């Protein structure tokens, strides 16, 4: 990678020596997750209602504005950007933003990646790789096509498999993400593990999070991953390893397959003490914590002037409000989410 300094449009100068932002608890903020759209071509039962009301398209930042915002964060020490949604690849002309951000790799940005449901991968995989994307996360909760249809409501299992094939053929490494749902897919996790490891992919299992109103009762879906790990250890030898990808997963090595298995446990063993990330929505709202409602409006600063001084000041002020941890709780006595906004707005 080169270490040149450059400026793109009115965006902030990009430099590899930018010092990371430090929050009130001494954590360096080096990771930006950008939800480029709240729209999705699936309606996963744990994520959103089937008849979702999405943001008016006129409220979304333009791709050029998202590029400028990302550039400001890179100038302030962010070295990893993940594009999320909704489903990021359904955003019109999204590859424009991917190309612009990919051009910043080596100029302050170390890695550009994305989380996807895989539905659009078959047509975008080669170009994603050409733009510098080397790793992606694909959400896949089951290998049973009928159950896949049930949980996604609108999803096409074969299309996702084609997308995984295309991404691997293009040279992109894949990590599968599976949300563990009690009495739905918990018995399938061993098969998902064998499938992933058999194809050279990591697997991460995730506890369901209480975000947004859905038709399902999350207390019925919730499965502590400590229970899942105990079940897996009846079949596999799991050894804790010191492996980090910049995210919250804690990894083990599976002796029988040789592959890695990650656990993301926001409910039973939160990852707040090492949190290095903030989340930007497609409307320019910055959430300093996934599980808190406090937010900063960066759109106003972005549009106030072509100079980035005001934007940088707004980002700095927001980081001073990054909390120590989230407020997630699964509580059957209060049948409401801990955070009202849906994951598709915040970016999962």
Swiss-Prot record:
UniProt record, GO biological process: Mo-molybdopterin cofactor biosynthetic process
Residues given in the record as GTP binding sites: 33, 82, 115, 175, 277-279
Reactions this protein catalyses: GTP + AH2 + S-adenosyl-L-methionine = (8S)-3',8-cyclo-7,8-dihydroguanosine 5'-triphosphate + 5'-deoxyadenosine + L-methionine + A + H(+)
Binding site for [4Fe-4S] cluster 1: 40, 44, 47
Binding residue positions for [4Fe-4S] cluster 2: 272, 275, 289
List of residues binding S-adenosyl-L-methionine: 46, 86, 139, 209
UniProt GO molecular function: 4 iron, 4 sulfur cluster binding; cyclic pyranopterin monophosphate synthase activity; GTP 3',8'-cyclase activity; GTP binding; metal ion binding; S-adenosyl-L-methionine binding
UniProt-listed Enzyme Commission number(s): 4.1.99.22
Cleavable signal peptide: none
Alphabetical UniProt keywords: 4Fe-4S, GTP-binding, Iron, Iron-sulfur, Lyase, Metal-binding, Molybdenum cofactor biosynthesis, Nucleotide-binding, S-adenosyl-L-methionine
Pathway where it operates: Cofactor biosynthesis; molybdopterin biosynthesis
Domain Radical SAM core: 24-248
The record's free-text note on cofactor binding: Binds 2 [4Fe-4S] clusters. Binds 1 [4Fe-4S] cluster coordinated with 3 cysteines and an exchangeable S-adenosyl-L-methionine and 1 [4Fe-4S] cluster coordinated with 3 cysteines and the GTP-derived substrate.
Keyword field contains Chloroplast: no
Pfam families for the chain: Fer4_12, Mob_synth_C, Radical_SAM
Function, in words: Catalyzes the cyclization of GTP to (8S)-3',8-cyclo-7,8-dihydroguanosine 5'-triphosphate.
Assembly behavior: Monomer and homodimer.
Family statement drawn from the similarity comment of this UniProt entry: Belongs to the radical SAM superfamily. MoaA family.
Descriptive protein name: GTP 3',8-cyclase
Originating species: Rhizobium etli (strain ATCC 51251 / DSM 11541 / JCM 21823 / NBRC 15573 / CFN 42)
Organism taxonomic ancestry: Bacteria, Pseudomonadati, Pseudomonadota, Alphaproteobacteria, Hyphomicrobiales
């Amino acid at each position: 990678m080169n270490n040149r300094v450059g400026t793109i449009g009115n965006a902030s100068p990009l430099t590899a020596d930018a010092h990371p932002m430090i929050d009130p608890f001494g954590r360096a903020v080096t990771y930006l997750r950008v939800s480029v759209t709240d729209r999705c071509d699936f309606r996963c039962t744990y994520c959103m209602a089937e008849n979702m009301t999405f943001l008016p398209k006129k409220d979304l930042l333009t791709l050029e504005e998202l590029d400028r915002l990302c550039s400001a964060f890179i100038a302030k020490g962010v070295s990893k950007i993940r594009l999320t949604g909704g489903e990021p690849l359904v955003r019109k002309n999204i590859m424009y933003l991917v190309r612009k951000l990919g051009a910043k790799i080596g100029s302050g940005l170390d890695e550009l990646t994305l989380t996807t449901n895989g539905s659009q991968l078959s047509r975008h995989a080669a170009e994603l790789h050409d733009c510098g994307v080397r790793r992606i996360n694909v959400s896949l909760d089951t290998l049973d096509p009928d159950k896949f249809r049930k949980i996604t409501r609108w999803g096409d299992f074969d299309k996702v498999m084609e997308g995984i094939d295309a991404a691997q053929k293009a040279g992109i490494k894949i990590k599968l993400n599976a949300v563990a749902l009690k009495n739905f897919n918990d018995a399938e996790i061993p098969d998902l593990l064998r499938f992933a490891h058999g194809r050279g992919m990591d697997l991460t299992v995730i506890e369901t999070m209480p975000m947004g109103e859905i038709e399902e009762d999350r207390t019925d879906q919730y499965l502590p991953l400590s229970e899942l790990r105990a079940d897996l250890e009846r079949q596999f030898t799991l050894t804790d390893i010191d492996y980090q990808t910049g995210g919250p997963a804690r990894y083990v090595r599976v002796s029988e397959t040789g592959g890695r298995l990650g656990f993301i446990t926001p409910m039973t063993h939160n990852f707040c003490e090492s949190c290095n990330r903030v989340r930007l929505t497609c409307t320019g709202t910055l959430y300093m914590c996934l599980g808190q409602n406090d937010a900063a409006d960066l759109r106003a600063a972005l549009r106030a002037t072509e100079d980035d001084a005001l934007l940088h000041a707004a980002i700095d002020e927001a980081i001073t409000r990054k909390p120590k941890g989230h407020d997630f709780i699964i509580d059957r006595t209060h049948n409401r989410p801990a955070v009202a906004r849906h994951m598709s707005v915040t970016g999962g």
